[in-house]
Amino acid sequence: MNNTPVITAVTVSQRIRSSSNQPSPEPSSMTAFLLSMQYVIEEGSGEGWFDDDLILWLTVTAVITGVLFIWRQLTYRQPIVSLRPFTDRNFTLGFLMNAVSGMSLFGGTFILPLFLGQIRQYSAAEVGTTMLVSGLVMFLSAPIAGRFVRSMDPRIPLVVGFALAAYGVGLGVRVTAEWGFWEFATLQAIRGAGVMMAMIAAQQLSVSTLPPELMKDASGLVNLVRNVGGAIGLAILTTILTDQTAVHLSELSAAMSVANLQGQDMLAGLTSMMEAQGLADPEGAARKFLGMALRRDAAVLGFADGFYFLALGCAAASLLGFLATPGKTKPASGGGGH
């Protein structure tokens, strides 16, 4: 569970209360909004979304407290989170792109180990070894990407970085049940280099045209949205994996039903194989084996849809880069991490 939005809310609330004796609904509305939103996006899929009363009421709570919080920031003379940076075009675009970079970073780190564990039955050590490629590439590319971003218009590395990330993650659309270390190594290397470049460039673009007095507020918003984007991305991926796997299983089951000639042939072949092994109930064993194979194939197709979602998000962020305006070249505030 991603607790950064909650920690941010609590920290800001404590600072406001300690610096003022006047009661204010702002800290509590922000905390309620972030807590409710985070629970809904992370638990909604598993609880059936609005079929669950708690999810429904927390959604209503998130909407009401979110609107209240934004209204207070726009009308209060000393808001705890200034929304003035959103009047800058580059910051608004960079804000959205940082959300996508968080989604790609956390989403890729979520979906790959899940595939390796569920489909390939990898041990924790084998999963860690495979995932090491992504972390290593991001670690090694961070200083190179930082220098690259600072040496030119940040829009160029932004577009290139997200395009690389989209291509890398897009390789996963062709995933099969036989994919292992080397297939995912290529995907992770391209994705890792692209995400690192995009993260640094998005951070740079966000503040490239802001006046100095808005830098502090902008930095906090950017760091927050990257983690919130990651949490939202994980919730969407979880929903995609659950729903699309069910859809694919239904389609595959229909194609392989006993009423279908291809399904009959496959079942007959499996039954003969089970008979040759001397099983007591060869047809029952064949049906069980076929069901397991269909569930595995449906899960693989669901993972492919998850990779497609991540690739689509990165591609959209790359296109947003063309809407940004040229800004001053400034040192990036940080290279990010993994």
How would you describe each model-predicted region?
Residues F33, T92, L96, S101, ...:
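Hydrophobic alpha-helical transmembrane segments of multipass membrane transporters and ion channels
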Residues I41, L116-G117, F148-V149, I236, ...:
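Interfacial helix-cap and linker-helix signal at transmembrane-aqueous boundaries
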